[in-house]
Amino acid sequence: MSWFDRLRQGLSKTRQQISGTAGPLDQEVQTAFTRIDNIEDLEYALIAADVGRAATEEIIEDIRKNGEGRLQDALMRALTLQLEPNARRAQFRELGFSPDVSRSKVDPKGHVVMVIGVNGVGKTTTIAKLGQYYMERGQSVMFAAGDTFRAAAGTQLGVWGERLGVPVIQGVDGGDPAAVAFDAAGARKARGTDLLFVDTAGRLHNKHNLMEELKKVRRVIDKADPGEPAEVWLVLDAVTGQNGLQQAKKFHEATPLTGVVVTKLDGTAKGGILVPIVRELGVPIKFIGVGEQPGDLQPFDSQEFVRALFDVELPKA
């Protein structure tokens, strides 16, 4: 099964949430918007899918001002633009160009990627999948088991490392995460490894001391390897919906994010949460996940996502 087919299948719950409550999407925009109940149904469907009230209002206004042809086509266009954090790229999309530029954006700017997120989002497994993704594209990879507070985390990453043939820098359970990060950053620099993924503890976003520790980890990485980490990626579980967005805001305040990885999109009807993440943080979504297999985590592309959401085939190359 192709990635697009897996994505389409994984977004089925969100698709049902929107199509089941939005009313008929195959009617003309001008016809649909003559009835207030059609507009209200569409608003309700988008908000229920966790698109967010502010983004929903913008989408409705966009359709009202610019929408021609079928309502579904206008809705897809408006959603695609909402998912573009880069205004220039959004303009290209609007003009009808669809260059595959968003996929190239997943190449890390530097050599160290700090991966953060609360417990239960699949952070350690996501790191393993990311490692495999970049190895398959010719990059050398290292892992740092910086989640020293969760007893099994280091062991789990170690098992993944053995399976993938990736070196793993580990500390002791309950040890200093910053020390692990410092040693790993120094080792990566000495060995000339292309990419180091630093796992971190599953921090609760309402615990000030844990957020402060994140800042410390970032500082010591920079001390061991100046200019790093060039990337800080937050892993979010799509099932958490709006609560996940609040998590993202707290993490972004503590240590500015450069990207978000959204997992478990196949387990929720709230796939619309991607819209407020991009809109309110201005941070790109790097990867999305719709399953347990390594190939079920792939670079995010807004046009591909929206087409899969509405079960519309990709245009022929």
From Swiss-Prot:
It is a peripheral membrane protein. GTP binds at residues 117-124, 199-203, 263-266. SUPFAM superfamilies: Domain of the SRP/SRP receptor G-proteins, P-loop containing nucleoside triphosphate hydrolases. Coiled coil: none annotated. Its EC number is 3.6.5.4. It is found in: Cell membrane; Cytoplasm. The keyword Heme does not apply. The keyword Nucleotide-binding applies. Keywords: Cell membrane, Cytoplasm, GTP-binding, Hydrolase, Membrane, Nucleotide-binding, Receptor. Its main location: membrane. One of its GO terms (cellular component) is cytoplasm. One of its GO terms (biological process) is protein targeting. Pfam families: SRP54 (PF00448), SRP54_N (PF02881). One of its GO terms (molecular function) is GTP binding. It catalyses: GTP + H2O = GDP + phosphate + H(+). Involved in targeting and insertion of nascent membrane proteins into the cytoplasmic membrane. Acts as a receptor for the complex formed by the signal recognition particle (SRP) and the ribosome-nascent chain (RNC). Part of the signal recognition particle protein translocation system, which is composed of SRP and FtsY. Belongs to the GTP-binding SRP family. FtsY subfamily. This is Signal recognition particle receptor FtsY. It comes from Deinococcus radiodurans (strain ATCC 13939 / DSM 20539 / JCM 16871 / CCUG 27074 / LMG 4051 / NBRC 15346 / NCIMB 9279 / VKM B-1422 / R1). The lineage of its organism: Bacteria, Thermotogati, Deinococcota, Deinococci, Deinococcales.
